[in-house]
Regions:
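Intrinsic low-complexity, glycine/proline- and repeat-rich
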Residues: 471-512
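Outer-membrane beta-barrel translocator/channel fold
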Residues: 18, 22-24, 43-66, 79-80, ...
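Transmembrane beta-barrel outer-membrane domains
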Residues: 24-28, 38, 50-52, 220-222, ...
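Outer-membrane beta-barrel initiation region
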Residues: 68-69, 75-312, 376-381, 512
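Transmembrane beta-strand segments that form the barrel wall of outer-membrane beta-barrel proteins
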Residues: 7-15, 21, 33-35, 39-51, ...
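A generic structural motif
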Residues: 71-77, 162-167, 263-267, 348-356, ...
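Extended amphipathic alpha-helical coiled-coil/heptad-repeat regions
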Residues: 282, 286, 318-328, 333-334, ...
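Feature captures outer-membrane beta-barrel proteins of Gram-negative bacteria and organelles
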Residues: 1, 7-11, 22-39, 45, ...
Length: 512
């Protein structure tokens, strides 16, 4: 009709005999009509009438991952680099004067905080400055490192010739990024500034950096919290293909010292479209995941997780983690992880082991009810030891592979393979599959565990820098074979953003 309005008419010879007999709908007319109105390129409103027994209004939202709905990311402009005055001279031994170091920390801390960057430590000699920082804002670590380098270059005495930035993520120092100060002053405004700066930069392992003696005053303890809406979804149930729950979620994190993190999440369901009767699993395997619907339906505020974590560097190329508490919604216990990952390598090797017990449906205690096809029974206890040897590899063009071999929650042994494609704007799309020694028949419908993973950066959707990502795993069925512990912040995911392959992939944002 017009560029924005479209009228559609359809004649269907299908009498829908089986669907009508099953009571799904009444088929009163073979004619279907629809009127589309394109409000914006990404928003369409449709009014329709179909089968002679249904009318409705439909709103369709479309999006292209290449184009942010919030437009170009609106970043805070970085500070310009001020070249050192040739006549500026710092007294010999100035770095040994405690009051000067304290004054630098006092001056740098609030300015970095405006950029969403926390100053964790500052180590000084007359010619070298090493700043340990944690980036809480920028999706790209090179962008945060560039902001820190600019500020240090402007604030430090002229005798400092070398500046190093140690990016820390959740208590883990992954690398040391070292710049000649002359290069910072020379390449800021040149056409090839980013590539020239990368050529002048050295990236090394940060295990040898003396973090504790260089700790910034007031860096710890830290406390943060957030409160907001939360949506959870359960898909592909035959009785309710799209089950949604809208709730409120409170998350808190306390960091009493470097590497020590205490985190917790409390969720309250507000409204949902769950069916009145939950689906009772018919799995003949121990119900390590197939009873998840009873966890979703718990009344009252639910403590989803409450953990104490310690992350540390046991040596060069090595990273470690200990965790204890309610590790995830369905399991609590102890977990340990060790990762070997050279700073300039595309390959990493990790080992994780956990001793866990299944939690109660209400989130408190460790006595879930027995579930059979006949209904709920007496409380039971289930504990297990699970763990995996994991290999990671970063291919070119944003492809990342992960292979896990080990013992799963149902005490089955097997292997998982996952392949992800990561895009420059932060989107991640991938798929995984798991095969264990549980037979296809014993596994039940679906034969083996598989799914699609997606990760969407908040910065893409809101047009402002943010390190928060929205993650979802789409499984056709949630069964008990090949089930893994759902731990957050595994070491490889924390470390790799600060290593050479990922830094080089995002280095174009260094001067942003």
């Amino acid at each position: 009709m017009t560029d924005k309005v479209t009228l559609k008419a359809e004649y269907s010879s299908d009498a829908y005999t089986q669907e009508v007999a099953a009571g799904h709908f009444e088929h009163r007319s073979p004619f279907n009509l629809a009127l589309d109105y394109q409000i914006k390129p990404t928003i369409q409103l449709t009014a329709y009438a179909q089968h002679g027994d249904e009318i409705g209004i439909l709103a369709s939202l479309t999006s292209n991952p290449k184009h942010s709905p919030g437009g170009a990311t609106r970043d805070r402009a970085p500070m310009p680099v001020l070249p050192r005055a040739k006549a500026q001279v710092a007294p010999a031994g100035w770095s040994e004067i405690p009051s000067l170091r304290s004054a630098l920390i006092t001056a740098l801390t609030p300015v970095l905080r405006q950029d969403g960057i926390q100053l964790i430590g500052l180590s000084l000699t007359d010619t070298i400055a090493i700043a340990t920082v944690e980036n809480h804002r920028y999706q790209s670590q090179p962008q945060a490192i560039g902001h820190v380098a600019r500020l240090l270059s402007n604030a430090l005495p002229a005798s400092v010739d070398t500046i190093a930035v140690v990016p820390m993520v959740k208590g883990i120092a992954g690398s040391q990024v070292i710049f000649p100060r002359d290069a910072l002053e020379a390449h800021e405004a040149t056409a090839t500034g980013a590539s020239d700066m990368r050529a002048a930069t050295i990236v090394t392992d940060a295990a040898a950096v003396d973090h504790r003696s260089a700790a910034a005053e007031g860096a710890f303890p830290q406390f943060s919290w957030s409160f907001g809406p939360d949506v959870s979804a359960s898909l592909f149930d035959p009785d309710n293909p799209v089950a949604l729950s809208l709730g409120a979620k409170l998350t808190a994190e306390w960091v009493p010292a470097r590497g020590v993190y205490v985190t917790g999440t409390l969720r309250q369901n507000i409204v949902d479209n769950y069916t009145s009767t939950p689906r009772y699993s018919d799995s003949i395997i121990t119900h390590v995941r197939s009873d998840s619907t009873f966890y979703d339906r718990a009344d009252g505020p639910v403590l989803q997780d409450l953990t104490a974590n310690y992350r540390f560097r046991p040596g060069t190329n090595l990273y470690g983690r200990f965790s204890a508490g309610y590790l995830e919604r369905m399991y609590g216990g102890l977990s340990a992880e060790l990762l070997w990952k050279p700073v300039d390598s595309k390959f990493g090797l990790g080992f994780e082991v956990s001793a866990v017990r299944q939690r109660s449906f209400d989130g408190l205690g460790f006595a879930p009810l027995t579930v059979t096809t006949a209904g709920l029974g007496a409380p039971r206890s289930y504990d297990t030891i699970t763990g995996h040897l994991s290999g990671y590899y970063a291919f070119d063009d944003g492809l990342h592979a992960q292979v896990d071999v080990g013992r799963y929650l149902a005490k089955d042994w097997g292997m998982s393979v996952q392949l992800n494609r990561e895009f420059n704007n932060g989107w991640k799309v991938g798929a995984y599959a798991t095969l264990t020694d549980i037979s296809f028949d014993d596994f039940g419908e679906g034969s083996f565990d598989k799914g699609i993973v997606m990760e969407i950066p908040t910065s893409w959707s809101i047009g402002r820098p943010s390190r928060v990502n929205w993650s979802v795993v789409i499984r056709p069925l949630l069964r008990d074979g090949g089930a893994k512990l759902d731990l957050s912040d595994r070491l490889y995911d924390l470390v790799r953003d600060t290593h050479v392959p990922q830094l080089e992939a995002q280095w174009g944002r260094f001067w942003r």
